[in-house]
Amino acid sequence: MALPGPAVFGPGSRGSLDEAGAEGREAAALAAAGVALEDEEEDDGRRGLLRWDGFSAWLHCVCVVGFDLELGQAVEVIYPQHSKLTDKEKTNICYLSFPDSNSGCLGDTQFCFRFRQSSGRRVSLHCLLDEFDKDLPVYLKKDPAYFYGYVYFRQVRDKTLKRGYFQKSLVLISKLPYIHFFHTVLKQIAPEYFEKNEPYLEAACNDVDRWPAPVPGKTLHLPIMGLVMKVRIPTCHDKPGTTQMVQLTQQADTHTSIILPTVHEVDLFRCFCPVFLHSQMLWELVLLGEPLVVMAPSPSESSETVLALVNCISPLKYFSDFRPYFTIHDSEFKEYTTRTQAPPSVILGVTNPFFAKTLQHWPHIIRIGDLKPAGEIPKQVKVKKLKNLKTLDSKPGVYTSYKPYLNRDEEIIKQLQKGIQQKRPSEAQSVILRRYFLELTQSFIIPLERYVASLMPLQKSISPWKSPPQLRQFLPEEFMKTLEKTGPQLTSGIKGDWIGLYRQFLKSPNFDGWFKTRRKEMTQKLEALHLEALCEEDLLLWIQKHTEVETVDLVLKLKNKLLQAGRESLPVKPDTVEKLRTHIDAIILALPDDLQGILLKTGMT
């Protein structure tokens, strides 16, 4: 199937998406979500699109964004054609796929952006991937409200064009936060695409459609235009801070393989290098969800630095919004730059000088220069007062009046400085810095984990004939009292006002998100234990002492328990589920024939 001639979509565009194709895309999503379709025509459309299920597990669509003299930045191609994007989403993609004009990015540039999914979608694409989400670390789970855009932008002089420059971006739109993986994919396909155009893009998309599903924990072999990428997506069961390396097999095609040591991590030290003296303070700001702006000379620097900041509190998830690259055209521009209220909990990466004035009321601003290649170390920036920041041309520095709660760890600074003097590779420095952040985060979170675990009711309080007991309430003062004996001092030598840091954290979006996640996990555990308790009962003996109405009610409740276990992915052993099914079947068979028939006809078994 050949691609048609490019249709242009963008700000002020005269084109429109093929609505039938868009409806078909939604039909595929509905089908995957288990939502019934209303008529035969839609059902036929769904069956015709099943071939794109493999593609949809990895990508929402691929866009080509070019510069039109009449329309400005415009989406020239969306592939597959049935992919659905709203006008608002297309406008955001248009502006976020090009560097600001002041960046002067000649040649090839790669960066990443993140944008809000338009409201009003009946079924979001993320429903296709939920089955894999449960095994992912929390920081790699998809956010149903956001898309990622991975960009390969080319700008070269071309005298044959009126504008004098060839300017085009190949953009991968995905729900998956696999930054390193998608940048690697773009490195393989974008240069060839700019030479060979649409037929090459179609062939690459067909390759993606044949990929296995993104299952966490498995070594995946992903062919793309003659090469094979070998990757492993982490699982929530991996030990934090360890990387399960993909092994190179002794096969004839080894010379064509690319082995990715990570799917999501950025070069942490390269990003923190200009500010590594203040890395612990930045860790605190990110942990507390403070409003933070990264002002950088190009989208590459801004996006890498924002992603490094978000990554520094791993394995905690950063629950607030973050925008690796943000422009004045963004649909949330007014929301995030208004002075009528306090700046929101968000990390923004910007390159336009206009932001130096627009965001000067924000409490924490990082101004960085060009990130140096590995081996070249920029001069360390200082912490400066916010009033000294007037323009984006201001000197690099961390502009804030924030006073850290913890004393600076001089040991990590000495370690990194020694690495600089010895010309230690950036990758090795990143390992040291990542381990430091991990140990710091774990020292902080372990006391919280220990206290939250104590909120779980005792297993002996779970009765099969009563609703599962509730978790005890989280009481901040009760938690604070536990810190004297089981606080972070057990695992960290860093001194300072840990209590003050905890008090501030308990008010933050990161605590709110973390606690909601833990509470959900513990509630599901209680439901699973309740299910196991039911399975251990002699239910046939129970029904002998109760009426038929009570027995039917029990069957319906047990069926609902089974449905809940599947729907919510409760941590129930397979043999427990099988045991419960056997109980249900035995109870139904003990009922009169007419009741058996009713339960069977209504699909209750």
Swiss-Prot record:
Modified residues (N6-methyllysine): K507
Gene: Dennd6a
Gene Ontology molecular function terms on file: guanyl-nucleotide exchange factor activity
Annotated compartments: Recycling endosome; Cytoplasm
Region (Disordered) residue spans: 1-20
Domain cDENN: 265-390
BP GO terms, sorted: positive regulation of cell-cell adhesion mediated by cadherin
PTM-bearing positions, type Phosphoserine: S124
Chain's role: Guanine nucleotide exchange factor (GEF) for RAB14. Component of an endocytic recycling pathway that is required for the control of ADAM10 transport, shedding of N-cadherin/CDH2 by ADAM9 or ADAM10 and regulation of cell-cell junctions. Required for RAB14 recruitment to recycling endosomes.
The entry's keywords: Cytoplasm, Endosome, Guanine-nucleotide releasing factor, Methylation, Phosphoprotein
Domain dDENN residues, every copy: 392-525
rRNA-binding is among the record's keywords: no
Entry protein name: Protein DENND6A
UniProt source species: Mus musculus
Pfam families for the chain: Avl9 (PF09794)
